[in-house]
């Protein structure tokens, strides 16, 4: 037992001594390393001190060897010009901008595309435009159901709920069921208007002289007879003549006045176009002026009217009883 205890104590003592020796060896090695580090740091310090001293010596030598007069920096040549240069103020800049050296600025306006006009369709109503009467109140001679009637702008057609919106030289604009429709002049009326000239009226007048119409007396109100006997110019109170234009005056549309007794008794029909008076062409504006001057001295007048493409002569007695032809003499 004692041997075992002694052996264990010896082993423990040997291990302890081994650790002590190992620790001492480590400390000795650490001291050696520290000494080497101290030597390296000391060498670096002296090296840096040597470099700094050399740099300072070189700078001092350059400062001493070069004179201050030689090393003085001369002033820039353009420096005084900068000091003396005139500065532009806002007024100068504005003056330059007003010269418009590169042209005056013109803003380009964006082009606005105009909507294209919508074409107006031709009306399908069963009506025919026979003539256009221009004047203070333009009218249109429209045929409905075989009857001709003169309508003014804004009036409504008798057989249709269509309003005359606009009257032009060769067509009429109608407003029907909220839509605008076009009623053009009939083709036969266009051709009739085209051939109605002085020569045609002259030929018609010659035929009227060669074959005069036979008239029979008709009864008219006494008030009308008395009014015409006193002043023949009052005939225009009973029969209104409105100029019809197509590249000039082609005639006068005959319409009844406030008292239509003379209009009906003389044989006029609404829509008749008077183209000649006493064999004088109505297409000449001077013919109406001559009529107004000669009317007070006339006893009767003869009107040549155009009705549905045919010409008719109507005689009116201004100072005696009124006569009208029992038949119509066509050209």
Curated annotation (Swiss-Prot):
Additional remark text: In many other E.coli strains this gene is part of a type II secretion system, but in MG1655 the locus is missing a number of genes.
Source organism superkingdom: Bacteria
Job of this protein: Involved in a type II secretion system (T2SS, formerly general secretion pathway, GSP) for the export of folded proteins across the outer membrane.
Matches recorded under InterPro entries: PDZ_sf, T2SS_GspC_N, T2SS_protein-GspC
Protein's UniProt keywords contain Transmembrane: yes
Subcellular location: Cell inner membrane
Membrane spanning stretches: 44-60
Family: Belongs to the GSP C family.
GO cellular component labels: plasma membrane; type II protein secretion system complex
Cross-referenced SUPFAM superfamilies: PDZ domain-like
Organism expressing this protein natively: Escherichia coli (strain K12)
Record membrane topology: Single-pass membrane protein
Keyword Cell inner membrane set for record: yes
Any Gene Ontology biological process: protein secretion by the type II secretion system
Protein keywords: Cell inner membrane, Cell membrane, Membrane, Protein transport, Transmembrane, Transmembrane helix, Transport
PROSITE patterns: T2SP_C (PS01141)
Protein name per its UniProtKB record: Putative type II secretion system C-type protein YghF
